[in-house]
Amino acid sequence: ALENVKEKFNCATAIFDVLNYISKRDLKKFLKEINLVLNQGGYFIFDVNSAFGFEEVAQGTITIDVEDKFIAIDANFEDNKLQTDITLFEKQENGFFSKQSDSIIQEYHPKKSLLKFLKECNFEVIDIKEFNLHTSENADKLIFICKKIA
């Protein structure tokens, strides 16, 4: 865990939905630990999925059929959590298919909650950028640029 890191840094990043993989229960602890590894005035930059990103972009089913592999990805957003079930079927040399399955869970953190936790963990939010990966109308990601103030 970050409390074991002895060095101090001018900037820390958490990209590709890292905070969405952290439960609401553990999020404040994570932010406190990020604060510990930053120099005074250091920056913390991270992205999170927006509600639109979870509800309209990530949720749904995708299937991919390529030669000797078939992948099914099924994502369901409910109670502020996105559960994604991934199943891979792969053709073996004997002609049979093997099956592997796994699930991942991401949690939606509302902007209001993030702002509250960041303030409580001594971060000033310098900017929040809306990022549109899939549509020009609605942001599916938010990028937070924060500065350690204490």
Per-region residue spans from a language model:
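A short glycine-rich, Lys/Arg-flanked "PGG" loop and its adjoining helix->strand segment in the class I
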Residues: 28-43
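SAM-dependent methyltransferase
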Residues: 25, 45-112
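Short aromatic-enriched loop/helix-cap "lid" or pocket-rim segments at secondary-structure transitions
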Residues: 8-9, 56-60, 140
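A short SAM/SAH-binding and catalytic strip from SAM-dependent methyltransferases
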Residues: 10-26
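Conserved beta-strand edge residues that scaffold enzyme active sites
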Residues: 1-2, 51-52, 131-133
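Short, hinge-like loop/turn segments at secondary-structure boundaries
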Residues: 12-13, 61-65, 144-145
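A short acidic, Gly/Pro-enriched loop at the edge of an enzyme's catalytic core
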Residues: 2-12
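C-terminal lobe and adjacent flexible extensions of AdoMet/dcAdoMet transferase-like proteins
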Residues: 111-150
